[in-house]
Protein backbone atom coordinates (compact mmCIF):
# COMPACT_ATOMS: atom_id res chain seq x y z
CA UNK A 1 0.00 0.00 0.00
CA UNK A 2 2.66 2.50 0.99
CA UNK A 3 4.72 2.05 -2.14
CA UNK A 4 1.60 2.38 -4.30
CA UNK A 5 0.84 5.73 -2.64
CA UNK A 6 4.45 6.78 -3.11
CA UNK A 7 4.26 5.85 -6.79
CA UNK A 8 1.13 7.95 -7.22
CA UNK A 9 2.93 10.92 -5.66
CA UNK A 10 6.07 10.40 -7.73
CA UNK A 11 3.97 10.13 -10.86
CA UNK A 12 2.15 13.32 -9.93
CA UNK A 13 5.52 15.03 -9.47
CA UNK A 14 6.81 13.61 -12.75
CA UNK A 15 9.75 11.71 -11.23
CA UNK A 16 10.66 9.22 -13.96
CA UNK A 17 13.61 7.58 -12.18
CA UNK A 18 11.60 6.93 -9.03
CA UNK A 19 8.76 5.45 -11.07
CA UNK A 20 11.15 3.09 -12.86
CA UNK A 21 12.63 2.04 -9.50
CA UNK A 22 9.22 1.52 -7.92
CA UNK A 23 8.02 -0.51 -10.89
CA UNK A 24 11.06 -2.76 -10.60
CA UNK A 25 10.51 -3.24 -6.85
CA UNK A 26 6.94 -4.42 -7.50
CA UNK A 27 8.13 -6.85 -10.17
CA UNK A 28 10.81 -8.16 -7.80
CA UNK A 29 8.09 -8.70 -5.20
CA UNK A 30 6.34 -10.95 -7.67
CA UNK A 31 3.55 -8.63 -8.75
CA UNK A 32 1.98 -9.33 -12.13
CA UNK A 33 2.86 -6.65 -14.70
CA UNK A 34 -0.84 -5.94 -15.26
CA UNK A 35 -1.33 -5.34 -11.54
CA UNK A 36 1.59 -2.89 -11.34
CA UNK A 37 0.21 -1.10 -14.38
CA UNK A 38 -3.31 -0.77 -12.99
CA UNK A 39 -2.62 -0.10 -9.32
CA UNK A 40 0.48 2.07 -9.52
CA UNK A 41 0.54 3.75 -12.93
CA UNK A 42 -2.99 4.00 -14.30
CA UNK A 43 -4.53 4.92 -10.93
CA UNK A 44 -1.88 7.61 -10.53
CA UNK A 45 -2.48 9.01 -14.01
CA UNK A 46 -6.22 9.22 -13.36
CA UNK A 47 -5.49 11.69 -10.55
CA UNK A 48 -3.22 13.67 -12.87
CA UNK A 49 -5.95 13.68 -15.54
CA UNK A 50 -8.58 14.88 -13.08
CA UNK A 51 -6.40 17.70 -11.78
CA UNK A 52 -5.53 18.73 -15.33
CA UNK A 53 -9.23 18.87 -16.17
CA UNK A 54 -9.92 20.92 -13.05
CA UNK A 55 -7.15 23.40 -13.81
CA UNK A 56 -4.94 22.40 -10.86
CA UNK A 57 -2.22 20.98 -13.10
CA UNK A 58 -1.11 22.37 -16.44
CA UNK A 59 0.35 20.91 -19.61
CA UNK A 60 4.04 20.92 -18.52
CA UNK A 61 3.27 18.99 -15.32
CA UNK A 62 1.08 16.54 -17.20
CA UNK A 63 3.83 15.93 -19.74
CA UNK A 64 6.28 15.22 -16.92
CA UNK A 65 3.83 12.77 -15.38
CA UNK A 66 3.26 11.08 -18.74
CA UNK A 67 7.00 10.85 -19.18
CA UNK A 68 7.36 9.25 -15.75
CA UNK A 69 4.65 6.75 -16.65
CA UNK A 70 6.59 5.89 -19.81
CA UNK A 71 9.61 5.01 -17.66
CA UNK A 72 7.49 2.48 -15.80
CA UNK A 73 5.87 1.23 -19.00
CA UNK A 74 9.30 0.59 -20.52
CA UNK A 75 9.84 -2.11 -17.86
CA UNK A 76 6.33 -3.53 -18.09
CA UNK A 77 5.84 -3.65 -21.85
CA UNK A 78 8.28 -6.51 -22.60
CA UNK A 79 6.61 -8.62 -19.89
CA UNK A 80 3.10 -7.77 -21.05
CA UNK A 81 3.85 -8.62 -24.67
CA UNK A 82 5.77 -11.80 -23.75
CA UNK A 83 2.91 -13.06 -21.60
CA UNK A 84 0.71 -12.67 -24.67
CA UNK A 85 -1.77 -10.32 -23.06
CA UNK A 86 -4.00 -9.59 -26.02
CA UNK A 87 -5.02 -5.95 -26.38
CA UNK A 88 -8.67 -5.52 -25.42
CA UNK A 89 -9.11 -3.27 -28.45
CA UNK A 90 -7.12 -1.48 -31.13
CA UNK A 91 -7.40 2.29 -31.42
CA UNK A 92 -6.27 4.85 -33.97
CA UNK A 93 -5.89 8.36 -32.61
CA UNK A 94 -4.83 11.68 -34.08
CA UNK A 95 -5.34 15.44 -34.00
CA UNK A 96 -7.50 16.62 -36.90
CA UNK A 97 -6.37 18.42 -40.04
CA UNK A 98 -5.34 22.02 -39.42
CA UNK A 99 -4.67 21.46 -35.72
CA UNK A 100 -1.16 20.95 -34.37
CA UNK A 101 -1.88 20.42 -30.66
CA UNK A 102 -0.99 16.95 -29.53
CA UNK A 103 -1.04 17.05 -25.74
CA UNK A 104 -4.66 15.90 -25.39
CA UNK A 105 -4.42 12.95 -27.71
CA UNK A 106 -1.03 11.93 -26.29
CA UNK A 107 -2.65 11.72 -22.87
CA UNK A 108 -5.70 9.87 -24.15
CA UNK A 109 -3.36 7.48 -25.95
CA UNK A 110 -1.44 6.79 -22.76
CA UNK A 111 -4.60 6.32 -20.71
CA UNK A 112 -6.00 3.91 -23.28
CA UNK A 113 -2.72 1.99 -23.40
CA UNK A 114 -2.85 1.79 -19.63
CA UNK A 115 -6.31 0.27 -19.94
CA UNK A 116 -4.96 -2.45 -22.24
CA UNK A 117 -5.81 -0.90 -25.60
CA UNK A 118 -3.24 -0.98 -28.40
CA UNK A 119 -2.90 2.59 -29.70
CA UNK A 120 -1.62 3.80 -33.07
CA UNK A 121 -0.96 7.53 -32.84
CA UNK A 122 -1.10 9.39 -36.15
CA UNK A 123 0.18 12.65 -34.67
CA UNK A 124 -1.16 16.05 -35.67
CA UNK A 125 -2.82 17.54 -38.76
CA UNK A 126 -4.45 14.23 -39.76
CA UNK A 127 -6.71 14.19 -42.78
CA UNK A 128 -9.73 11.93 -43.28
CA UNK A 129 -8.00 9.45 -45.57
CA UNK A 130 -5.12 9.03 -43.13
CA UNK A 131 -7.57 8.17 -40.34
CA UNK A 132 -9.48 5.69 -42.47
CA UNK A 133 -6.39 4.06 -43.99
CA UNK A 134 -4.96 3.56 -40.50
CA UNK A 135 -8.24 2.13 -39.15
CA UNK A 136 -8.27 -0.43 -41.94
CA UNK A 137 -4.55 -1.19 -41.86
CA UNK A 138 -4.46 -1.84 -38.10
CA UNK A 139 -7.86 -3.51 -37.98
CA UNK A 140 -8.89 -1.01 -35.31
CA UNK A 141 -12.28 -0.73 -33.63
CA UNK A 142 -11.87 2.67 -31.96
CA UNK A 143 -11.16 6.03 -33.59
CA UNK A 144 -10.05 8.92 -31.40
CA UNK A 145 -10.01 12.46 -32.79
CA UNK A 146 -8.71 15.47 -30.96
CA UNK A 147 -9.03 19.20 -31.69
CA UNK A 148 -8.08 22.18 -29.55
CA UNK A 149 -9.24 24.92 -31.89
CA UNK A 150 -12.87 25.79 -32.50
CA UNK A 151 -11.91 26.29 -36.16
CA UNK A 152 -10.70 22.71 -36.56
CA UNK A 153 -13.51 21.03 -34.63
CA UNK A 154 -15.86 20.79 -37.64
CA UNK A 155 -13.30 18.61 -39.42
CA UNK A 156 -14.33 15.79 -37.10
CA UNK A 157 -17.69 15.77 -38.84
CA UNK A 158 -15.93 15.57 -42.22
CA UNK A 159 -14.21 12.38 -41.06
CA UNK A 160 -17.41 10.85 -39.66
CA UNK A 161 -19.31 11.77 -42.83
CA UNK A 162 -16.62 10.12 -44.94
CA UNK A 163 -16.95 6.92 -42.89
CA UNK A 164 -20.72 7.06 -43.42
CA UNK A 165 -20.27 7.64 -47.15
CA UNK A 166 -18.13 4.52 -47.34
CA UNK A 167 -20.73 2.58 -45.38
CA UNK A 168 -18.32 1.71 -42.56
CA UNK A 169 -19.32 4.16 -39.82
CA UNK A 170 -20.86 1.43 -37.66
CA UNK A 171 -17.67 -0.62 -37.55
CA UNK A 172 -16.05 1.91 -35.21
CA UNK A 173 -16.50 3.48 -31.82
CA UNK A 174 -15.66 7.14 -32.34
CA UNK A 175 -14.34 9.25 -29.48
CA UNK A 176 -13.75 12.97 -29.80
CA UNK A 177 -11.96 15.20 -27.36
CA UNK A 178 -10.41 18.61 -26.89
CA UNK A 179 -10.86 21.79 -24.92
CA UNK A 180 -13.80 23.45 -26.69
CA UNK A 181 -15.90 20.30 -27.06
CA UNK A 182 -18.90 18.99 -25.20
CA UNK A 183 -21.35 16.10 -25.42
CA UNK A 184 -23.75 18.05 -27.59
CA UNK A 185 -21.03 18.68 -30.13
CA UNK A 186 -19.95 15.03 -30.07
CA UNK A 187 -23.53 14.08 -30.87
CA UNK A 188 -23.71 16.72 -33.58
CA UNK A 189 -20.68 15.34 -35.42
CA UNK A 190 -21.99 11.80 -35.04
CA UNK A 191 -19.46 10.53 -32.50
CA UNK A 192 -20.18 7.99 -29.77
CA UNK A 193 -18.28 9.48 -26.87
CA UNK A 194 -16.65 12.67 -25.78
CA UNK A 195 -13.85 12.72 -23.24
CA UNK A 196 -12.93 16.01 -21.64
CA UNK A 197 -9.18 16.55 -21.89
CA UNK A 198 -8.32 12.90 -21.49
CA UNK A 199 -9.90 12.84 -18.02
List each model region and its residues.
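Amphipathic, non-transmembrane alpha-helical secondary structure
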Residues: 5, 17-20, 24, 70, ...
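Long amphipathic alpha-helical segments
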Residues: 1-83
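Glycine-rich active-site/cofactor-binding loop and its immediate structural neighborhood
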Residues: 86-122
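Alpha-helix N-cap/loop-to-helix initiation residues
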Residues: 58, 100-101, 152
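Cofactor-cradling patches in redox/metallo enzymes
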Residues: 108-115, 120-191
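Conserved, mostly hydrophobic/aromatic
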Residues: 19, 55, 101, 112, ...
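Short glycine-enriched loops at secondary-structure junctions
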Residues: 42, 96-99, 125, 180
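Short acidic-hydrophobic, aromatic-tinged amphipathic segments that line or gate anion-handling sites
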Residues: 193-198
Amino acid sequence: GELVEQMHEDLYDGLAEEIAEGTQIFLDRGWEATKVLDAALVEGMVVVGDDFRDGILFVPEVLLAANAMKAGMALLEPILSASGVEPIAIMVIGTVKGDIHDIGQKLVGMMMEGAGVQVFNLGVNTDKDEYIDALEEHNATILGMSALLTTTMPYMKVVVDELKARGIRDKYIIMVGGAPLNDEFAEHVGADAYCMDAG
